[in-house]
């Protein structure tokens, strides 16, 4: 059997704390190429920290994280950029750069770029942002900037196969009308190339309808690694300390929070 694409082997992450660093984990998780996994949990649970650990942006204080069987610490940055693309929650300010140059930053680590402008335009189209070509990034709305950054990550992974996409709240700043279309587009993009897609989300309905597995994180630990199926409802209620109602029709699943008794 082929190795998992990514493995966390009892990996811990030391976080600043008082009076001593408070470790997150240990995490023992794995995923394979082509899988779609949503990371869910309350605010402050450690979802973004887990994603940084998986990306190699925050090194493990104990245990290790393996990409294709090799510890992330042993990958050079250029080789790592060719195998995984990351969309963090906090984006660096791109000042007055034109949109197409921001998107092209995803291609920098790949060296020679025979696709050139074609890939940049196709990535912007996939993020429903073609009309932003030529605009200055710092003049865009928050939602427009989010789409450009999504296009940057897609451009980085455009001509790779069976890589890893790590995205942190990729659709948080977008209007509801765009969210479903872009989530469909991101999932289709990953599936067409065999990429594993891991997304930190707050939207339970996106997670249940667009992802196969759920990693439920609470207080820096894994509460559950489960399938995104109705049977996960009790675990989600435990995760958020609230009651949920599950609705289902031909269009998919919907989870509604129930008002707590006074």
Question: Language-model segments: which ranges?
Answer:
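The feature captures the beta-strand-to-loop junction immediately N-terminal to the Walker
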Residues: 40-42
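Helix-to-loop junction immediately C-terminal to a conserved catalytic motif
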Residues: 55
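Conserved ABC transporter NBD signature motif
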Residues: 63-71
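H-loop/switch region of ABC-family ATPase nucleotide-binding domains
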Residues: 201-202
């Amino acid at each position: 059997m082929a190795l998992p694409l990514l493995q966390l082997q009892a990996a811990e992450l030391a976080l600043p704390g008082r009076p001593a660093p408070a470790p997150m984990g240990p995490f023992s998780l794995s995923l394979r190429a082509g899988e779609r996994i949503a990371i869910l949990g309350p605010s402050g649970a450690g979802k973004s920290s887990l994603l940084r650990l998986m990306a190699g942006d925050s090194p493990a204080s104990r245990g290790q994280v393996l990409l294709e069987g090799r510890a992330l610490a042993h990958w050079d940055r250029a080789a790592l950029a060719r195998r995984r693309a990351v969309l963090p929650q906090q984006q660096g300010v791109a000042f007055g750069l034109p949109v197409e140059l921001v998107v092209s930053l995803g291609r920098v680590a790949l060296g020679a770029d025979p696709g050139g402008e074609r890939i940049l335009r196709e990535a912007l189209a996939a993020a429903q942002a073609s009309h932003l070509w030529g605009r200055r990034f710092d003049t865009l709305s928050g939602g427009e900037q989010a789409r450009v950054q999504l296009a940057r990550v897609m451009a980085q992974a455009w001509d790779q196969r069976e890589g890893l996409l790590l995205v942190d709240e990729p659709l948080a700043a977008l209007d509801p009308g765009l969210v479903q279309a872009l989530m469909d587009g991101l999932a289709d993009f990953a599936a067409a190339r065999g990429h594993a897609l891991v997304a930190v989300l707050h939207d339970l309905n996106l997670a249940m309808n667009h992802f196969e597995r759920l990693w439920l994180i609470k207080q820096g630990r894994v509460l559950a690694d489960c399938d995104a199926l109705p049977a996960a409802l009790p675990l989600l209620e435990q995760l958020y300390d609230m009651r949920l109602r599950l609705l289902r029709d031909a269009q998919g699943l919907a989870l509604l929070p129930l008002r707590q008794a006074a």
